[in-house]
Amino acid sequence: MYAIIKTGGKQYRVTEGQMLKVEKLAQDVGQSVKFDDVLMVAAGDELHIGTPSVKDAAVTAEVVDQGRQAKIEIIKFKRRKHHMKRQGHRQDFTAVKVTEIALGKAKKEVKTDGA
């Protein structure tokens, strides 16, 4: 079973037990976080695709770590002018471990003509 979730402006394919680095979340280490914006769930040969998200589906994860990525350097310069600007950036992240992919009651609506 796997799911595609959306968090922090990005989409991730997750399975149960998977470790994942996502954009910084407000929860502390050891707390549980629930991702409700599930775009797709595949369970065996069943495929549930949301429009835009699957109703009653949720992915639960446990926060394992809060940290910062490796530094990237941004360098801007103007040729032949002896002018250079250096800048660095470290992005914050939250490492989570997916504990459960829950697919709620997926009810199919049947339209009937009132004739």
Swiss-Prot record:
| Highest taxon, organism lineage | Bacteria
GO CC terms, sorted: cytoplasm; ribonucleoprotein complex; ribosome
Gene Ontology biological-process entries: translation
What stretches pass through the bilayer? none
Q: What keywords tag this UniProt record?
A: Ribonucleoprotein, Ribosomal protein, RNA-binding, rRNA-binding
Gene Ontology molecular function: rRNA binding; structural constituent of ribosome
Family the entry assigns: Belongs to the bacterial ribosomal protein bL21 family.
Main function: This protein binds to 23S rRNA in the presence of protein L20.
User: Tell me, how does this one assemble?
Assistant: Part of the 50S ribosomal subunit. Contacts protein L20.
Q: What protein does this entry describe?
A: Large ribosomal subunit protein bL21
Name the species this protein comes from: Coxiella burnetii (strain Dugway 5J108-111)
Output the lineage of the source organism.
Answer: Bacteria, Pseudomonadati, Pseudomonadota, Gammaproteobacteria, Legionellales
